[in-house]
């Protein structure tokens, strides 16, 4: 026969002094938390050590591309709405459920 024994208190299982000992000094030390595993960027002498990204984000080019994409998307949505409205005008003899199924199948 197998006999199980249980500890009478939780202190018999684990010593209380070791259960909740957590080293939390790292969480409160901002320098160690953010910069412990990386290099110190304040030691850089000049900007030649960093990549040159001038001209990468040209605002006028990004604005024109965004405007072009937005206008094409708006035109596509308008065409879709017009097609759906014309379809619903011709399919008035169908039930509402069938029109809903046709909408999602379209």
From Swiss-Prot:
Keywords: Apoptosis, Synapse. Interacts with ced-9; the interaction results in ced-4 release from the ced-4/ced-9 complex. Interaction with ced-9 may enhance interaction of ced-9 with drp-1, but not with ced-4. A ced-9/egl-1 complex may recruit drp-1 to the mitochondrial surface. Residues 73-81 are annotated as: BH3-like. It is found in: Synapse. Plays a major role in programmed cell death (PCD or apoptosis) by negatively regulating ced-9. Binds to and directly inhibits the activity of ced-9, releasing the cell death activator ced-4 from a ced-9/ced-4 containing protein complex and allowing ced-4 to activate the cell-killing caspase ced-3. Required to activate programmed cell death in the sister cells of the serotonergic neurosecretory motor (NSM) neurons during embryogenesis. Required to activate programmed cell death in the sister cells of the M4 motor neuron and I1 pharyngeal neuron during embryogenesis. InterPro entries: EGL-1. One of its GO terms (biological process) is apoptotic process. Disruption phenotype: Mutants block programmed cell death. In an ain-1 mutant background, enhances the proportion of animals arrested at the larval stage, with egg-laying defects and with a ruptured vulva. This is Programmed cell death activator egl-1. GO terms for cellular component: cytosol; intracellular membrane-bounded organelle; mitochondrion; presynapse. Its main location: other. It comes from the Eukaryota.
């Amino acid at each position: 026969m197998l006999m199980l024994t249980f500890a009478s208190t939780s202190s018999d299982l684990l010593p209380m002094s070791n259960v909740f000992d957590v080293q939390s000094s790292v969480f409160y030390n901002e320098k160690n938390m953010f910069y412990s595993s990386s290099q110190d960027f304040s030691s850089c002498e000049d900007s030649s050590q960093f990549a040159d990204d001038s001209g990468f984000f040209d605002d006028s080019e990004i604005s024109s591309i965004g405007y072009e994409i937005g206008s094409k998307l708006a035109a596509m949505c308008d065409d879709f709405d017009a097609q759906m409205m014309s379809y619903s005008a011709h399919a008035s003899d169908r039930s509402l459920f069938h029109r809903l199924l046709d909408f999602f199948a379209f």
